[in-house]
Design a protein with these regions (language model features):
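Flexible loop/hinge segments at secondary-structure junctions
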Residues: 23-388
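Gram-negative bacterial Sec-dependent N-terminal signal peptides
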Residues: 1-22
Length: 388
C-alpha cells in the first residue's frame, strides 16, 4: 500500500511539473482566509508549489461569488477576459445562486458541469474592541445584537467585570462590502435577538434593517470599511470601537483585544464539539444529498455550548475545466487538503480543521476515482469545462 501511494504521489508530482508553465488556477473572494490561502506565490496552502494556484485575491465573499458565477474577472479587479476557476466564500451558496447556475446556458452547469461547494476550515468570528484602559470585556449575545443594531450606544451601558464602562460613545466598525463574515455574525445575532437584528446577510445594512450611513438610530456611531485588514486597523486606532473580524487578523485568544461572548473567547475546544454535531452528506444518517452543493456547508446559528459565532469558510468550484492543468491542480488541492495535510497550517492561522469525517467525505466524493462527482470526471466533462 505504501509503495502504491508513493507511485501515485510521484506521478501526481510529475503531472504538476509538466503543467507548471500553462497552469493558472485563478480565483478569490472572502478576505477572511486570505492569509491561509496565500496572496503571493508560495505563502499559503493554495499558492505553495503543490498545488500551485495563482495568488488568492482577497476581496469579499460577495465579490468572489459574483466573479465565479458570471466568470467575470473584473469583479475581482482582474483584467477582463481572465477565466475565474473558483471562489472563496464564507457566505454559503444560496438556493437562488445554485438554481441560476444549474439553469444557465452559458455560465453554469451546461457549460461547466455540476456546481461544487466544499468547506475548507471552520472559523469563529472574533469581536475586537478598543476601550482605553479596559483589558477584558464579556458580552452576552443579546448585548452584542444591541450594540451592532445601535441600541447600546455608550460604553457606560456595559459592565467591564463589575465596573461600568466609561462615558464613551460606542463606535461600530462594520463591513461595507458583501462580507461572509457579516453573514456568519448576523446569522447568530438574528437567531438570538431578531428584534434587534432581523436578517442575516452578507450586507450589514440588510441584516440590521437600516442603512448606517443615512438612517442609523439617533445617537449611534457607525464607521464602514471594506475588508478584514481595514476592520483590524480601524478598531485598533479608534477609541470606543468594536467590530467583527476573521480570527486570523487579530490576537483572537487575548482578552485585552477581543471580547468574550457568553463567557468564551473565540479560541477553545468546545467549538470542535459544535462542529461534530453535523454529519457530512456521505454519512447514511445525515439525510443529505452529496450531489447537492447546499448540503455540504452546515450552519450553527446558536450553539448550546462554547463560543457562539462560528461557521465555515468554503471554496466553490465547477466539476469540469477545459485546461487539464487546472483539473490537475484543483484535484491536487482536494487530495492534499482533505487528507489532512494542511491541518497544522489551518490551526496556525487561528482556524479549526474540519472533523475527520468531513475530510474523508469531501475526499471520497470529489477526488476518488470511483466517484461520479469527482473533479474532472471524463464521463461528465467530455467537451465542457470552465474556460482556459
Amino acid at each position: 500500500m505504501m509503495f502504491k501511494y508513493g507511485l501515485m504521489a510521484v506521478s501526481c508530482g510529475m503531472a504538476l511539473g509538466a503543467a507548471q508553465a500553462m497552469a493558472a488556477v485563478v480565483g478569490g473572494g472572502s478576505s477572511l482566509p486570505m492569509k491561509l490561502y496565500g496572496t503571493a506565490i508560495g505563502d499559503g496552502i493554495l499558492t505553495a508549489s503543490y498545488p500551485g494556484f495563482q495568488p488568492y485575491i482577497g476581496r469579499s465573499s460577495g465579490e468572489g461569488k459574483a466573479a465565479f458565477f458570471s466568470n467575470d474577472a473584473t469583479k475581482l479587479r482582474l483584467a477582463a477576459g481572465t477565466a475565474i476557476d473558483y471562489a472563496g466564500s464564507d457566505s454559503i451558496v444560496s438556493l437562488a445562486e445554485r438554481d441560476a447556475y444549474n439553469s444557465s446556458a452559458t455560465v453554469g452547469r451546461a457549460s461547466f458541469g455540476p456546481l461544487i461547494q466544499i468547506p475548507v476550515a471552520a472559523t469563529t468570528v472574533a469581536i475586537p474592541y478598543h476601550v482605553s484602559g479596559k483589558t477584558a470585556l464579556n458580552l452576552s449575545s443579546a448585548q452584542l445584537a444591541d450594540i451592532f443594531s445601535g441600541k447600546i450606544q455608550n460604553w457606560k451601558q456595559v459592565l467591564f467585570g463589575d465596573v461600568r464602562g466609561p462615558d464613551l460613545p460606542v463606535k461600530v466598525i462594520y463591513r461595507t462590502d458583501g462580507s461572509g463574515t457579516t453573514q456568519i455574525l448576523t446569522t447568530h445575532l438574528r437567531a438570538v435577538k431578531p428584534a434587534s437584528v432581523p436578517g442575516n446577510s452578507i450586507n450589514f445594512a440588510t441584516a440590521v434593517g437600516f442603512n448606517p450611513v443615512t438612517n442609523a438610530p439617533v445617537g449611534s456611531t457607525y464607521i464602514g470599511v471594506s475588508g478584514s485588514e481595514a476592520v483590524a486597523s480601524t478598531v485598533a486606532n479608534t477609541d470606543g470601537a468594536i467590530g467583527y473580524i476573521s480570527p486570523d487578523f487579530t490576537d483572537f485568544d487575548n482578552a485585552a483585544v477581543v471580547a468574550s461572548v457568553n463567557g468564551f473567547l473565540p479560541a477553545g475546544a468546545i467549538v470542535q464539539l459544535t462542529l461534530d454535531t453535523e454529519l457530512p452528506p456521505t454519512h447514511p444518517s445525515s439525510g443529505k444529498d452529496p450531489a447537492n452543493p447546499l448540503d455540504w456547508v452546515p450552519t450553527f446559528p446558536n450553539p448550546s455550548n462554547g463560543y457562539p459565532i462560528i461557521g465555515y469558510t468554503n471554496m466553490i468550484f465547477s466539476q469540469c475545466y477545459k485546461d487539464p492543468a487546472d483539473t490537475i491542480r484543483i484535484r491536487a488541492f482536494i487530495n492534499s487538503h482533505y487528507s489532512g495535510q494542511n491541518n497544522s497550517a489551518v490551526t496556525s492561522h487561528s482556524f479549526i480543521p474540519l472533523p475527520a469525517m468531513w475530510l474523508s467525505g469531501v475526499h471520497s466524493t470529489f477526488y476518488n476515482a470511483s466517484s461520479t462527482l469527482r473533479v474532472g470526471n471524463p464521463d461528465v466533462c467530455n467537451g465542457i469545462g470552465r474556460p482556459l
